């Protein structure tokens, strides 16, 4: 709120990797999301729910999860950006989309200073779409909670994946190895 009052315009960047500025192109304050942290909220023998800060690098988070055998996000391992940007676009690749693993998204409403929590059913997820691509430009995503499995079930529906592994390797595939394969493709 204070930044908005001071500068009038705010531009929120995640990593900023797809953004180029000319010196005179934006009159306002550029805010980069840099919060970090991964917290276990729930865990049982089958699943884990993680609260992940929006400023975490997406790829690093996915690799971390795969190394711990927290499964589901493997096919999204090669996507660049941050955790907070992932629900905005409902990122997806190789037969997976992030919406299938999101429990909730927590955001800061810059117009009134409120923290809001949106459960997956309220995020309006669709193909490369969410509520944040529509009318909710005043909301800054702060945290995303993911529900991941502890048993790995590979998603091998894309031919590029099948062509990258042998039948024998497919039988012994791990989440971590799947991340490597996706990154190599």
Question: Where are these predicted regions, by residue range?
Answer:
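Generic preference for hydrophobic/aromatic residues in regular secondary structure cores
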Residues: 38-39, 102, 141, 158
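Anion-binding (especially nucleotide phosphate/pyrophosphate-binding) glycine-rich loop
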Residues: 1-101, 109-111
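Phosphate/pyrophosphate- and phosphate-bearing ligand-binding catalytic cores of soluble enzymes
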Residues: 19, 115-185
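Hydrophobic side chains in beta-strands
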Residues: 33, 107, 146-148
